[in-house]
A protein has these predicted regions:
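Active-site gating loop/helix substructures
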Residues: 13, 120-205, 232, 238
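Generic structural signal for well-ordered alpha-helical scaffold segments
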Residues: 22, 26, 109-114, 160, ...
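Core residues of folded domains in eukaryotic genome-function proteins
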Residues: 1-6, 37-39, 123, 135-136, ...
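Terminal low-complexity/disordered tails
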Residues: 209-240
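A short acidic (Asp/Glu
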Residues: 52-53, 195-196, 226-230
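Patatin-like phospholipase
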Residues: 2-5, 14-108, 144, 152, ...
């Protein structure tokens, strides 16, 4: 039996690109993304999309369509990536502090996820993050959230953990129910911007899928096409 995986890369505001692709898939097939795949992996902005598509409403149906999540970038983008003049002064123009305060991101995630837990997702998820104190990759998975209460966290906390990009947002302190106490988490894109490998590991491990039965859809967020000449690169320094 084919085991279907969706993998969504990180990429900040460019997450609107895979969001639009997923919107078209839902429109053409007429079914929610959560019913089309057995496992969804997402990093950073891709993690927010994955969580959004898997969040249930009170009736056990998807709370957010891909179309609604496309709107997230239009309606919330300016709030998430907003910094006051006062913040610019305190951070010395991003030299001494994160570029953006976390309030805008936290408010947006609260509106979209509320108190929903990772264990409640409509489809199994894998969401990478990174613990800067322990220097270890962290994988939030629905599988462990459902089987081990200590691994279950609010979806909005998981979303903030995978999206706290260094220099843009301060690390997210996630309190745990274990002896560890807390995790100091940053954007999973620092080691797994494309979470396909994490999805493969989860599929063949926790989910018990066979490698020969996997079908993977991997969505990126585009890339810069501006070439850099060898001559220019040869003169790179700290200020130019």
């Amino acid at each position: 039996m084919t085991f279907k995986i969706l993998s969504i890369d990180g990429g900040g505001i460019r997450g609107i690109i895979p969001a639009v692709v997923l919107e078209e898939i839902e429109k053409i097939i007429g079914k929610p993304i959560s019913s089309l795949f057995d496992l969804v992996a997402g990093t950073s902005t891709g993690g927010i999309l994955a969580l959004g598509l898997a969040k249930p409403n009170p009736y056990g149906l998807p709370e957010h369509s891909a179309h609604k999540l496309v709107g997230l970038y239009d309606s919330e983008g300016t709030n998430i990536f907003h910094r006051s003049f006062f913040h610019k002064i305190l951070s010395l123009g991003n030299l001494s502090n994160a570029k953006y305060p976390t309030r805008g991101l936290e408010d947006a995630l609260d509106r979209y996820f509320g108190e929903a837990m990772l264990s409640e997702t409509l489809v199994d998820l894998v969401i990478p993050s990174y613990d800067i104190e322990k220097r270890l990759p962290i994988y939030f998975t629905s599988y462990f959230a459902k089987g081990r209460p200590g691994f279950d966290h609010k979806m909005r906390y998981v979303a903030q953990s995978t999206a706290s990009a260094p220099t843009y947002f301060k690390p997210f302190k996630l309190r745990t129910g274990s002896d560890v106490g807390h995790l100091s988490l940053i954007d999973g894109g620092v080691f797994a911007n494309n979470p396909t490998l994490a999805a493969l590991s989860e599929a063949t491990g926790s989910c018990g899928a066979r490698i020969g039965n996997l079908f993977i859809v991997s969505l990126g967020t585009g890339q810069g096409a501006r070439p850099i000449s060898l001559k220019r690169a040869a003169n790179w320094g700290l200020v130019g």
